[in-house]
UniProtKB/Swiss-Prot annotation:
This is Leucine rich adaptor protein 1-like. Keywords: Acetylation. Residues 1-81 are annotated as: Disordered. Residues 8-21, 28-39 have a biased composition (Basic and acidic residues). The keyword Acetylation applies. The modification N-acetylmethionine is found at residue 1. Signal peptide: none annotated. It comes from Rattus norvegicus (Rat).
Length: 221
């Protein structure tokens, strides 16, 4: 039997719903099996005579019967051989029981190891599921952030290139005017409009002026 600490069998008893046999528990603890009461005496003599008087009274009868019937000696000779065969069978049976108990002990230890391995694997699976859920939530947040950024950039680009929207055109024009104001010496379209209006007004005023006439008249006769 393998030497080692006594395993705790309460977990297995709770899972199986049955109590571990006492003989198996004794085998696990390394104790010897309890002796059975009323075991047969291998010599075959003990228990046959209760007192010396009965044995002495039994001996003459046996001798007289043996002297009277000489042919009855063969069953008496076969009786010790039958006891020997029975003792041999009992010894073999006890040895097989010891081997079975040792096998049960090994199986019980293997079951305990398997139970611990299953518990550790279950714990690892639960931890992996927790890490996977956290990773999926983080990846989902990152994907949503990237999608929102790409959508906003695409919308801004489309609004800049969409000429059908008057508001966008005004906003783009005002933005360009603002940029032109920042550049020194650059004339904006509004400055050109003011320049053309002022030149037209000056030309019209020059046309409306009357020519200056001399006050002296010359008469030719």
């Amino acid at each position: 039997m393998e030497d080692g600490p006594l395993p705790d069998l309460r977990d297995i008893e709770l899972k199986l719903g049955r109590k571990v046999p006492e003989s198996l528990a004794r085998s696990l603890r390394g104790e010897e099996p309890a002796p059975r009461e009323g075991a047969a005496d291998p010599s075959g003599v003990g228990g046959s005579c209760s007192s010396s008087s009965s044995c002495s009274s039994f001996a003459p009868s046996v001798s007289s019967s043996s002297s009277s019937s000489p042919a009855s000696g063969s069953p008496r000779r076969s009786h010790p051989s039958a006891l020997e065969r029975l003792e041999t069978k009992l010894h073999i049976l006890r040895q097989e029981m010891v081997n079975l108990r040792a096998t049960d002990v090994r199986l019980m230890r293997q079951l305990l190891l398997i139970n611990e391995s299953i518990e550790s694997i279950k714990w690892m699976i639960e931890e992996k599921a927790t890490v996977t859920s956290r990773g999926s939530s983080l990846s989902g947040s990152l994907c949503s952030l990237l999608e929102s950024q790409s959508t906003s950039l695409r919308g801004s680009y489309n609004s800049l290139h969409d000429g059908s929207d008057g508001l966008d055109g005004i906003s783009v024009g005002s933005y360009l005017d603002t940029l032109a104001d920042d550049v020194p010496g650059h004339q904006t379209p509004s400055d050109l409009d003011q320049f053309s209006d002022s030149s037209i007004i000056e030309d019209s005023q020059a046309l409306h002026k009357h020519p200056k006439l001399d006050s002296e008249y010359y008469c030719f006769g």
